[in-house]
Amino acid sequence: MFMKFLKEWVFPIAIAILIVVLIRSFLFTRVKVSGPSMEPNLQDNENVFLNKVASYKRGDVIVFNAKDEDPRYQSGDDKYVKRIIAIPGDTVEYKASNLYVNGKKVNQSFISLNERTQGTEMSFGSTWSLKTLSSGTLWQKKDRNNSTVPKGKYFVMGDHRSVSNDGRYFGFVDKKHVVGKVIVPF
């Protein structure tokens, strides 16, 4: 009787729990968006599912460990949620209220015209490039004075440009610090 109970109930439940733990550990996980930096597309306190084994391209929304990338962020295990603007080898410029990657104007239909032309808390001026941004003191020394995104790194920005603490401030995001790609908000 006890063996039948183990066989019919305990083993299947244990296997199901093991499968869920493995999927969550290696393939997918859930993260809560914290703050308004991705509005209007992702809201503060909104949950998102991440694909932890995805490849990343321009326009993808990713989650990465804040303390690994932002030198001002020193505690906790909070995550930043940002959009990839540029991938390794890309150049980035902002001029005449437009964003350019590799000399081509970026279609930013995912945000309002007003947000496309917004600056940030710091004034970078009406024109900037990776080279001018990377001369900033908050960027890590190894990333300073780059005119292109280095190998294994990404340049990211929040969709709510006027309030987003993003790559314009802290520099490039290392691929090894990316937790995953947002696949489903809920």
Model-predicted segments: where are they?
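Short, Lys/Arg-rich N-terminal segment immediately upstream of the first membrane anchor
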Residues: M1-E8
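Soluble "head" domains of membrane/secretory-pathway proteins
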Residues: F2, L22, D44-F186
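Hydrophobic alpha-helical segments, especially transmembrane helices
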Residues: E8, S25, V31, R83-I84
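Hydrophobic membrane-insertion alpha-helices, especially the h-region
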Residues: V10-F26
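Alpha-helical transmembrane signal-anchor/signal-peptide segments
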Residues: T29-D44
